[in-house]
């Protein structure tokens, strides 16, 4: 059953374009007032923290450059925004332009504009539009899949398929992770939705075309499978709500209490290949068992109960083996992890970089 809420009903032939054919629609509800469009995918660079920048630097060098990741999707958090704004600066320093992050399955993030304008991005397969980005996407049909009128179609089905089978990597933030890598944004008192993350953040078994990054994730247990998608979860090891790593996700109890047949887990641990905290990167794809995954996670969760499960000697050996990496292992200077390294520090700066085409949504405008 397809129900459409619309702002207006017009005569036949007056639509500028057709996104949904009329014979697919069962019911039309005309709204009493226009539906408010929200800038769902916009993150203000001014709110990016130094920890996000450090984690972004580690991700670029220790994951994207290490595996040659070219096609990817970012979630809508500040972690992804930081990485997008680091590409024209830190990524440029590493000589990675044209080698990583060239093809995106992504809503039109304003924070990607500096990378687009500096020649990093070849194509963006967008799910849909974003408030304030219409003029910019219309002006860049070389990057975005726009129609003859310059507008983005509702492209969700194609973008989901590209995300499931076409791209090399999904990266997203989470609020809580258990000791084997299951994660969720549903916690006590915080029922954050996780949108398309379960679709993007899983190893789709039907893929057969190969890339370097995909092949490097091949199981090490003699499986015939030749590769899998990189699934990266980013999270601070602790916050004001307590440790990010917990023995059991609060989502399990919440799901049980709500009568759900399946717990609202965002991404299953068996699909997670990398976990990044402010302490370092755990290369979970190298783990052979759940116990090994726990050990790697403990190395990037020092100062929490989970972190007590490994000794300094364990950490030293795992660093040497390349199963975990701290900033120093990646030759990253922690003191550089601040806003000075971002390609733009405000949305107003992004608007300037866009040549005035990006319009900062009212919610973010300085009063």
Regions flagged by a language model, labelled:
Residues 1-74, 78-102, 110-367:
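Conserved phosphate- and dinucleotide-binding cores of soluble alpha/beta proteins
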Residues 106:
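Active-site histidine-anchored catalytic micro-motif
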């Amino acid at each position: 059953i397809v129900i459409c809420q619309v702002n207006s009903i017009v005569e036949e032939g007056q639509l500028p374009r057709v996104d949904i054919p009329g014979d697919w629609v069962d019911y039309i509800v005309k709204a009493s007032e226009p539906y408010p469009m929200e800038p769902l995918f916009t993150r203000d660079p001014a709110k990016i923290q130094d920890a996000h920048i450090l984690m972004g630097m580690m991700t670029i060098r220790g994951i994207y450059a290490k595996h040659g990741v070219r096609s990817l999707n970012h979630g809508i958090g500040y972690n992804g925004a930081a990485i997008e704004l680091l590409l024209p600066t830190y990524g440029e320093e590493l000589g990675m332009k044209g080698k990583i992050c060239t093809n995106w399955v992504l809503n039109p993030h304003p924070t990607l504009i500096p990378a687009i304008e500096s020649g990093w991005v070849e194509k963006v397969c967008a799910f849909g539009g974003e408030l304030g980005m219409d003029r910019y996407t219309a002006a860049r049909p070389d990057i975005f899949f726009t129609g003859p009128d310059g507008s983005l179609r509702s492209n969700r089905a194609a973008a989901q398929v590209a995300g499931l089978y076409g791209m090399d990597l999904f990266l997203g933030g989470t609020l809580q992770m258990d000791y084997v890598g299951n994660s969720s944004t549903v916690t006590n008192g915080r029922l954050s939705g996780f949108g398309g993350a379960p679709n993007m953040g899983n190893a789709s078994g039907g893929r057969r075309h190969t890339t370097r990054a995909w092949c490097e994730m091949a199981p090490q247990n003699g499986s015939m499978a030749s590769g899998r998608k990189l699934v990266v979860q980013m999270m601070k090891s602790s916050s004001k709500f307590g440790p990010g790593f917990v023995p059991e996700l609060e989502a399990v109890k919440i799901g049980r209490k709500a009568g759900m047949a399946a717990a609202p887990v965002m991404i299953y641990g068996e699909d997670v290949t990398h976990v990044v905290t402010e302490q370092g990167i755990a290369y979970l794809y190298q783990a052979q068992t759940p116990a090994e995954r726990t050990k790697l996670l403990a190395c990037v969760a020092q100062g929490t109960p989970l972190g007590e499960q490994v000794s300094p000697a364990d950490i030293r050996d795992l660093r040497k083996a390349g199963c975990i990496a701290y900033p120093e292992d990646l030759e990253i200077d922690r003191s550089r992890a601040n806003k000075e390294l971002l390609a733009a520090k405000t949305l107003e700066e992004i608007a300037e970089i866009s040549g005035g085409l990006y319009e900062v949504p009212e919610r973010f405008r300085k009063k």
